[in-house]
């Protein structure tokens, strides 16, 4: 009898230990354990993944901006801090999302149009920004001053759900309107959306532009620091055009109310090393309400 009780007790202890181990493993895989920075949940947009991991360790969660924004919009409380671009916290504020985000700007880089230098030289309006390039999409190069062998004008942009994708949409809206005061009821807003609809959304737009230059895209929307870091030996074949009005990607640390604090200074170091500069006062984006409409959240 005692032997039977002992066996049952031993089995119970083994099962209990396995359940505890499974629980710990689950916490580890879901990211609910502490990170290398000592915080329970830091979420980072895909574009800033390398800088985030350098700053806060490999346990940060990396996902596209829209995924995190939707979680926060639904009242997600499992996030202490969201490392993203300015514009995203503003659109959540416009949606009256609670808890509120405490935002600290860290570093900025211009949003630019990177174009095939040889071909851009034949497009008279190339320096005018989005309104020029988007309106030219699909036109034969021979009809806009280029060579017939180049085919048609093509433009690539990051996918809308990405952190940069929202900035591209916002900058296009301001370009067509002429200022950041654009509203969703303005015809220029609609025109910018129609024009962007002709561009190719590509999650690897910068890599494909550079690796297949000059064939894949005539021009793309990108972050200046990223182009500088990846262009390599093809730098002399690429021309960068600042946007009109100017637009910037500003990396921010957005702390969720009640969440653990995150040292923004740690993020500034890898971004500065990657060519980012001190944060600008204005990102050149429309207001949060317009960005909310563009996001589709």
Regions from the PLM with identified roles:
Residues 1-36, 256-297:
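Extracellular/periplasmic juxtamembrane helices and adjacent flexible linkers that interface
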Residues 26-151:
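N-terminal segment of the mature folded domain
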Residues 47-49, 66-69, 87-91, 119-121, ...:
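Solvent-exposed loop/turn segments at secondary-structure junctions
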Residues 47-51, 67, 132, 136, ...:
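Extracytoplasmic/secreted proteins, especially bacterial periplasmic and envelope-associated proteins
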Residues 104-113, 233-265:
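Periplasmic-binding protein-like
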Residues 112-196:
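Helix-loop-helix "hinge/cap" segment bordering the ligand-binding cleft or interdomain interface
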Residues 128-142, 155-161, 251-284:
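Bilobed periplasmic-binding protein/Venus flytrap-like ligand-binding cleft at the lobe interface
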Residues 171-243:
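Ligand-binding pocket segment of bilobal, Venus flytrap-like solute-binding proteins
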């Amino acid at each position: 009898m005692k032997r039977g009780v002992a066996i049952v007790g031993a089995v119970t202890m083994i099962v209990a230990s396995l359940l505890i181990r499974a629980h710990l493993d689950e916490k580890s895989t879901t990211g609910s354990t502490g990170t290398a920075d000592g915080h329970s949940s830091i979420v980072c947009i895909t574009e800033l993944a390398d800088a985030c991991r350098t700053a806060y360790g490999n346990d940060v969660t990396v996902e596209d901006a829209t995924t995190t924004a939707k979680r926060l919009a639904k009242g997600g409380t499992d996030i202490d801090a969201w490392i993203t671009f300015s514009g995203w916290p503003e659109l959540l504020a416009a949606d009256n999302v609670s808890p509120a985000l405490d935002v600290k700007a860290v570093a900025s880089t211009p949003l630019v149009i990177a174009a095939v230098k040889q071909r851009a030289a034949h497009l008279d309006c190339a320096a005018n920004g989005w309104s020029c390039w988007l309106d030219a999409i699909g036109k034969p190069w021979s009809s806009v001053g280029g060579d017939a062998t180049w085919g048609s004008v093509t433009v690539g942009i990051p996918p809308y759900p990405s952190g940069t994708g929202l900035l591209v949409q916002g900058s296009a809206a301001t370009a067509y309107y002429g200022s950041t005061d654009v509203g969703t009821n303005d015809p220029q807003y609609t025109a910018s959306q129609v024009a962007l609809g002709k561009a190719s959304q590509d999650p690897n737009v910068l890599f494909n532009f550079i690796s297949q230059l000059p064939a894949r895209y005539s021009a793309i929307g990108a972050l200046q620091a990223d182009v500088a870091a990846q262009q390599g030996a093809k730098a002399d074949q690429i021309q960068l055009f600042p946007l009109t009005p100017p637009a910037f990607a500003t990396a921010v640390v957005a702390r969720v109310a009640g969440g653990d604090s995150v040292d923004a200074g740690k993020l500034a170091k890898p971004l500065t090393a990657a060519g980012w500069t001190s944060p600008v006062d204005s990102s050149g984006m429309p207001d949060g309400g317009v960005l909310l409409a563009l996001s589709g959240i």
